[in-house]
Amino acid sequence: MQQRASSTHVGSQSAAHALLEKVAGSAIGLDLELPIATGERRRRIYLDSTASTLRLGVVQDVLDRYQPYYANTHSTVHFGARLSTQEYRWAHDMVLDFVGADKQRCTAFFVGSGTTGGMNRVAATLSQRLPGRDVVITSIMEHHSNDLPHRKYFKTVVHASPEYGSTSMGCVDLKAIERALEANKGRVAYVSVTGVSNVTGIINPIREIAALAHAHGALMVVDAAQMIAHVPIQMSGNANPAHDIDIVVFSGHKIYAPGSPGVVVARRELFEGGVPVEVGGGMVDDVWLDRFTPTASLPDREEAGTPNITGAIGLGAALYALHRIGMDTLFEEETELMQLALGKLSAMPEIAIYGDTDMCRYPRAGALSFNVRGMHHALTAAILNDYFNIAVRNQCFCAHPYVREMVTEALAASDDGLTAAELEALAEMQRGMVRASFGIYTTREDVAVLAAALADIIARRDFYEQQYDVTPTGDYQHKTFRFQSEAQFNIRDAVDTWLTR
């Protein structure tokens, strides 16, 4: 495997790093080679882990071992059902351990559509449980999944602003959170913020935000979709109880188990009593023609229907593997990698990096977003893919308000003399960024290749721009090179091959 960020720790840390190397190197797809516009084949560099991570080999191995025993849960009468039920329950316990949740006070349950499904469940449930509190406080940094559900179920959603560092926006402004709590005293149901921005990777001070929320009688909800794979989480048992988190929501596909469900971890009393938002099989004690009795048992009452058993077991395997490594070790490694990436990109004046880059003041994890000045983000992403086989993401990353604010801020700093209306119009036209995001398998060499590719794009801008046409949808399409996806893989041919061999 390629060289990773260096470490000076010894002893138990050496063992942890050995496990890290083994687990990281097992990720499926690291050696994938694909044709590029030059006619060569090149190994893919996967820098899109914030969107979805690659599956770890250990997860695939666990699923392969489990699959012969597969059966539905909700029964222990036959061996397969008994085994599936036991391991499905173990996956719940592993979730609680991984986020540092008190097992006596907290429950974990799985939901179908990732963090989005989890946040919708949280908002719908708490709007019923807290009828006198019709305000939710969040921030402008949020992914739509930690914004729109609150808008749907609550009368008012307040979007707290970020701090401003020496160069750009930083983390959520604690003073803005406090002002919003004071202005809506007695009405705030909960504060819900992302632990780590899916755009900039900036880490928010969730413990301090929790203390503010609790001081005003509000709950603290953390969108951990991006945090879960990069930063240690301690939900319960903090030295200061005010720092404890009431609800954590995340997605399994963000933590090396694609195909696994979303997860809600919450204080039990918040989901006890009443009728759950989703009803069906498995969440009732009894049903008559004119009524039904929901079970009081958690997590069963929040998991109507047949669960994603295989996905949950895969998630449990991923969490246990990372638990064996230690999230502190992983965070240390990834911090070094982020510092390396920021250093290389910051050295290029033609690159605009979004969010304040002072990692001492505003630590980051997992992702950074940028643009080549004067080049459309879609073109930059297309060139990185077509000529270098570097997989990045572009556009607004389901965080339109945040991206709009940062693009406008950058344009205002570089384009003197524009009126407010002209600036707004230009920002809308250029709204979007390129995002490079890292996983446990990202190496120093991957970062170096990205930096070299960007340097080449800057040096040969005219050449690259001449190779592309703009499509009616605003995408950039190479004039001569076409990636034939069906030649690489398609479901029909894969089935036909199996059937005829």
Language-model regions, residue ranges each:
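Pyridoxal 5′-phosphate
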Residues: 1-501
